Amino acid sequence: MHRLDKRKYNQLREVSIIPDYNKHAEGSALIKFGDTHVICNASVEKAVPRWMQDKKTGWVTAEYGMLPRSTNERMNREANRGKQSGRTMEIQRLIGRSLRQAVDLDKLTGYTITIDCDVIQADGGTRTASITGGTVALYKALQKIEKEDAIKNLVAAISVGICKDELLLDLDYEEDSNAQCDVNIVMNEALELIEVQGTGEEKAFSKEQFKDLVDLAENGLKDLFTLQKEVIKNG
């Protein structure tokens, strides 16, 4: 299949991560997957949710949103509608679940870390970019409060799919919109699965195709883990 940006089927978009993008946040990163750009801010609070107050542990959570002009046409802010959409809630729960797999919460007793992921420009893969960039922001925040030992694993995510019967890595919006199936895969740096979200949009896909998609994602995630490590080391 001919990809509009001339990428090979197994090639990531150009990916960059700028750490410490926001001087106010304990940890932050601006992540770019091609034309998808997301700001991830990690804020540390010396408190835990009420339901955790009797437990010797900490908490990591996430919020997600898209700026009004992050897409082709302006969207109304969800705050003006009075509630978040089901899509937004689903995505921020996914991000939170994924990032909690990066840390040992028992080493964060008394702390809550909130990762805010704000999409400033969207071209597919905003949730996977949020997880990958959010991990760097979380790591930088833990360095700031000298809790780096709480990190268990780096976590990253990528999308894969089938378009015109061909497997593709890191779908942009056009590819995602026309995919027969698309799958979001979250792994840790040991290449263990954390979460898989997959849908046969136009047709069902086989177990063999699913395995091939996971293998394709794994190869892309290896590159993302390498990038995360470089950014954390040199940032």
Enumerate the predicted regions with their spans.
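Glycine-rich, flexible beta-strand/loop modules in the N-terminal catalytic cores of phosphate-handling
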Residues: A29-L108, L193, Q197-D215
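N-terminal, positively charged regions that mediate nucleic acid binding
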Residues: M1-T57, K222, T226
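Glycine-rich, charged/polar anion/phosphate-binding loops
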Residues: V15-I17, H24-G27, E45-V48, R100-A102, ...
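A structural signal for small-residue-enriched, beta-sheet-centric alpha/beta enzyme cores
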Residues: K107, G125-A129, Y139-A141, E148-G235
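Solvent-exposed alpha-helices and their adjacent loops that cap or buttress functional pockets
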Residues: R7-Q11, Y21-H24, L30-F33, M52-K55, ...
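Structured core elements
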Residues: S16-I18, L30-K32, I39-N41, T61, ...
